[in-house]
From Swiss-Prot:
It comes from Bdellovibrio bacteriovorus (strain ATCC 15356 / DSM 50701 / NCIMB 9529 / HD100). The gene is gcvP. The keyword Oxidoreductase applies. It is an enzyme of class 1 (oxidoreductase). GO terms for cellular component: cytosol; glycine cleavage complex. The modification N6-(pyridoxal phosphate)lysine is found at residue 705. The glycine cleavage system catalyzes the degradation of glycine. The P protein binds the alpha-amino group of glycine through its pyridoxal phosphate cofactor; CO(2) is released and the remaining methylamine moiety is then transferred to the lipoamide cofactor of the H protein. GO terms for biological process: glycine decarboxylation via glycine cleavage system. It catalyses: N(6)-[(R)-lipoyl]-L-lysyl-[glycine-cleavage complex H protein] + glycine + H(+) = N(6)-[(R)-S(8)-aminomethyldihydrolipoyl]-L-lysyl-[glycine-cleavage complex H protein] + CO2. This is Glycine dehydrogenase (decarboxylating).
């Protein structure tokens, strides 16, 4: 045996792909095939198959080799101390949070908590987040996170317009807001026809009515202003007031809710979440209770379960895009749950007193810094400040250069104005180094300690000083030792079913392995400590990796260019449609505003089209779930003068490779439109088909699905877009970092130049380790696994849609509608009963009501697939018992599911099935049982009696 025959023990492909080669052979045999290629010939239309070599993807490397390669690459980065601010600050992540949440697969592999009975832990952490946000900002209700500060501000603008009664289409933005936030607001405003007036709000004369006004608090210069009188003036004119805040500052400052704000937005990053070159971080939006039904994003509320016990759930879901489609309050589908939970745990760990102490220390250091700069005869900005000092100087360039020489970054406002924003990691020694930089390398001649001793206490005027208590709830005042914190984190995580327990077979979600090797680099300081607006020369290694990821994604998809800026799939849709819109405008065809969307589309599609002011025209689907090509052709021709785009998911939302995709694209192109492909199902294409070649002009790719970024319990996500050569010049840019996009591109859709940059290494690592052949095999095994499940279940449940050869793509839909007619058992009952078997339910009632969509992914072993199949077959037998009258139609194991340990231990058991049948319906559960901690949650009760923050979270554990 030669060395070439001895592959490294950490070769990644067999670690990622669940079924062994012998398993694959057996599964193929079940389907009547001898090889994966033979199966592929019957599943994937020949006209879209590719023989491309994927040279830029490469041949794959080992896990150990990957870590060494990436470490060499990012070692080119320069990790300086960052005092740039602008909503991004260095922070100290408590190690108990880093190790037990950020780096813990129980927290990062969970899905969005749509199944509340097996999600109570992260729902509680999110309720803590909402409470923290509402309390600190003096508001009544907050959502469970948004994508970033800029996106949150843009959502607030849209919400303000919806709430305003004066029918205005203009709004005022203070020029003292962070510039990147202004840019994102402007991006959102322009296609909607809103006029953004950037000027001093105090000087606006109201000659033109406005629906809102935006303030930064403290502002981008670091100054704390009293906005109460100005806010009242705008409210008197019918406008809504929005403030963008700094959470740490809110522990000391009068909260916006007390000076008239209707909405408050911001970024929770400095509560223990690393900088990460711009993200991911949890944005937030808080408002008044009266406005809750127009809030964007997810909202956790308190309800009760079937036993009358308090339980948490996602509330008011009728606002969301998956239900309201183009009439939704937002197109957002992904939040930032993992990062919101880190921030909320940071608040739990420090408590209100601890947070205030951190804030007071930052404030004191800022006062010391300011006093020292004045002693150096520098012109320091006037006004009350919290953490930022500005200096006017004619030596700005020399000072910036000196600071960089001393491995520090200051903010350069331009015009000889510099800024320094301090943070919780700043020390007295750091302050002295900052003085030396402003003194062009010479020591100040006095110490920070001496300045501190001579400086009076820092006080703010009474009107700017917080007097109200915050975070008084018990949860924020109980877990301050590491022992207590560790136990609280584990107490919560034990309530949640994640990929650490079992397969999560959610259709259209691709819950594949999030490999440890892919995730390890995210914590490296060469990545986590980079400020998004630091000089790009300091991030040369990470930017090299980003460009290589773009190159690999282009190679995989066949597109000419890729933008990694969109920080969610919904934002990829939005950015892609803006690119199409700008392309039409560049050709003098800006009037094109019709967007064709199949009736089966995911709700984000019409919601995104509405955000770019396109008119949605629905295209019919046939009985097999395929786009009705005749209807498409008729509508494309009917609207040919105004046709902007078609949005189509491929493979289809029904989990089938539609044979007519090339013809569909041609019809749109022949009528002047562009084709937007929703890439939600790209896990069935990689290595086999290249959408940029077979017809679509633009597509987003969900890196949190196909390319292994974890779902985080409902975020983060990344939704980059790939485009054809004719659209490349219109990809998103960023006004503060020109290198991030083309000069003629659309303006920024996210706050940071490369979006959620710190998690991009996850997808880069996945692609690099898998290589072209590994990616191809992953795709084929994902298709094989879906067809294996469909084949095994078709004798028990109808499989709703198949391709022309009787096969599905990477997911299958089982139909429960007839079962409901014969037994009264519905799709919800099946979903809840699966929890008793230790499984998360497949996707319920999408894309067809009364069905379950199953996507196993390539990462699940045959043993796990068989376990799921056995569970579904056993459930079908339980349904049969109801159908035959052997089991009661209402009092049965499905209607009463899930069963908790508390239910089991009650002395009375008034059910016609045994306790054993309830919780051990199959033998293998006896050795490894996941126990839901609440019974079936009452959704209607939760919406009727909405509580979205907690007087004491422990009250709901009783």
């Amino acid at each position: 045996m030669k060395i070439a025959d001895l592959s490294p023990t950490n070769e990644f492909i067999p670690r990622h792909i669940g079924p062994t080669d012998s398993d694959i052979h057996e599964m193929l045999k079940t389907l009547g095939f001898n090889s994966l290629d033979q199966m592929a010939d019957k599943v994937i239309p020949a006209q879209i198959r590719t023989t491309h070599a994927y040279a830029d993807v490469g041949n794959g490397i080992s896990e150990h080799g990957l870590l060494n390669h990436l470490k060499q690459m990012v070692s080119k980065n320069k990790v300086y101390k960052n005092y740039i601010g602008m909503g991004y600050h260095d922070t100290i992540t408590p190690t108990v949070i880093q190790r037990n949440i950020f780096e813990n697969p129980v927290w990062y592999t969970a899905y969005t908590p749509y199944q509340p009975e097996i999600s109570q832990g992260r729902l509680e952490a999110l309720l803590n987040f909402q409470t923290m946000i509402a309390d600190l900002n003096g508001m009544e209700i907050a959502n469970a996170s948004l994508l970033d500060e800029g996106t949150a501000a843009a959502e607030a603008m849209f919400m303000a317009h919806s709430l305003c009664k004066n029918k205005a289409n203009a709004f005022v933005v203070s020029p003292d807001m962070h510039p990147h936030v202004i840019e994102v607001i402007g991006t959102r405003a322009e296609p909607l026809g809103f006029e953004m007036i950037v000027m001093d709000p105090a000087k606006y004369d109201f000659a033109k009515p406005v629906f809102g006004v935006f303030f930064q608090y403290p502002n981008t210069n670091g100054t704390v202003e009293d906005y109460a009188a100005i806010a009242k003036k705008y409210k008197d004119h019918g406008a809504l007031v929005t403030a963008s805040t700094d959470l740490l500052a809110m522990t000391l400052l009068t909260p916006p809710g007390e000076w008239g704000a209707d909405m408050v937005v911001g970024n929770s990053q400095r509560f223990g979440v690393p900088l990460g070159f711009g993200g991911p971080h949890a944005g937030f939006l808080a408002t008044k209770d009266a406005f809750k039904r127009l809030m964007p994003g997810r909202l956790v509320g308190v309800s009760v379960d079937s036993q009358g016990k308090s339980a948490l759930r996602l509330a008011l879901q009728t606002r969301e895009q998956h239900i309201r489609r183009e009439k939704a309050t937002s197109n957002i589908c992904t939040a930032q749950v993992l990062l919101a939970n880190m921030a909320s745990m940071y608040a739990v760990y420090h408590g209100p007193a601890g947070l205030k102490k951190i804030a007071l220390r930052v404030q004191r250091l800022t006062a010391i810094l300011s006093a020292g700069l004045k002693k150096l005869n520098l012109e320091v900005g006037a006004g009350h400040v919290f953490d930022t000092v500005t200096v006017k100087t004619d030596k700005a360039a020399e000072i910036i250069a000196q600071a960089e020489k001393m491995q520090m970054n200051f903010r350069n406002y331009g015009g000889g104005k510099l800024g320094v924003s301090l943070n919780e990691a700043t020390t007295l020694e750091d302050v002295e180094q900052i003085w030396a930089a402003f003194n062009l390398g010479k020591a100040a001649g006095f110490t920070a300690l001496s300045v501190d001793e001579s400086l009076a206490d820092v006080t703010l005027p009474a009107n700017l000083t917080r007097s109200t208590a915050y975070m008084t709830h018990q949860v924020f005042n109980s877990h301050h030792s590491e022992t207590e914190m560790l136990r609280y984190i584990h107490h919560l995580q034990n309530k949640d079913l994640t990929l650490t327990h079992s397969m999560i077979p959610l259709g259209s979600c691709t819950m594949k392995l999030n490999a440890t090797t892919e995730l390890v680099p995210v914590s490296w300081p060469e990545i986590s400590k980079l400020h998004p607006f630091a000089p790009t020369a300091q991030a040369v290694g990470l930017i090299e990796m980003i460009h290589d990821l773009e190159k690999k994604l282009c190679d995989i998809t066949g597109f000419a260019a890729v933008s990694l800026q969109p920080n969610a799939g919904s934002q990829g849709e939005y950015a892609g449609l803006l690119v199409i819109r700008k392309y039409h405008q560049s050709r003098g065809q800006g009037h094109r505003n019709i967007c064709l969307i199949p009736s089966s589309a995911h709700g984000t599609n019409p919601a995104s089209a509405a955000l770019v002011n396109m008119q949605v025209v629905v295209v019919a689907c046939d009985d097999q779930g395929n786009v009705d090509v005749a209807d498409l052709k008729a509508k494309a021709e009917q609207h040919k003068d105004n046709l902007a785009a078609l949005m189509i998911t491929y493979p289809s939302t029904h989990g089938v490779f539609e044979e007519g995709i090339v013809e569909i694209c041609k019809i749109i192109h022949d009528n002047g439109g562009q084709v937007y492909m929703d890439g939600a199902n790209m896990n069935a294409l990689v290595g086999m088909c290249r959408p940029g070649v077979f017809g679509p002009d633009v597509s987003h790719m969900n890196l949190h699905k196909t390319f292994s970024i974890p779902h985080g319990g409902g975020g983060p996500g990344v939704g980059p877009i790939g485009v054809g050569a004719h659209l490349a010049e219109f990809l998103p840019k960023h006004s503060l970092v020109p290198e991030a996009g083309p000069a003629n591109g659309i303006s920024a859709t996210t706050s940071a130049p490369w979006g959620s940059a710190s998690i991009l290494p996850i997808s880069w690592a996945y692609i690099t380790m898998m290589g072209a052949q590994g990616l191809r095999k992953a795709t084929l095994v994902s298709i094989l696994s879906a067809n294996y499940i469909a084949k095994k279940l078709e004798a028990h449940y109808p499989v709703l849609y198949k391709g022309k050869n009787g096969l599905v793509a990477h997911e299958c839909i089982v139909d429960v509608r007839e079962i409901k007619k014969t037994s009264g058992i519905d799709v919800t009952d099946v979903a809840k009963r699966l929890m008793d078997f230790g499984f998360h339910a497949p996707t319920m009632s999408f894309p067809v009501a009364g069905t379950l969509m199953i996507e196993p992914t390539e990462s699940e072993s045959k043993k796990e697939l068989d376990r799921f199949i056995e569970s579904m077959v056993t459930i079908r037998k339980e349904i049969a018992a109801v159908e035959t009258g052997k089991m009661d139609k209402e009092n049965n194991a499905l209607k009463n599911a899930p069963h908790t340990a508390q239910m089991l231990m009650k002395p009375e058991w008034n059910h016609p099935y045994s306790r054993e049948e309830a919780v051990y319906p199959v033998e293998w559960l006896r050795g490894n049982k996941f126990w839901p901690v609440v019974g079936r949650v009452d959704n209607a009760y939760g919406d009727r009696n909405l509580i979205c923050s907690c007087p004491s979270i422990e009250d709901y554990q009783a």
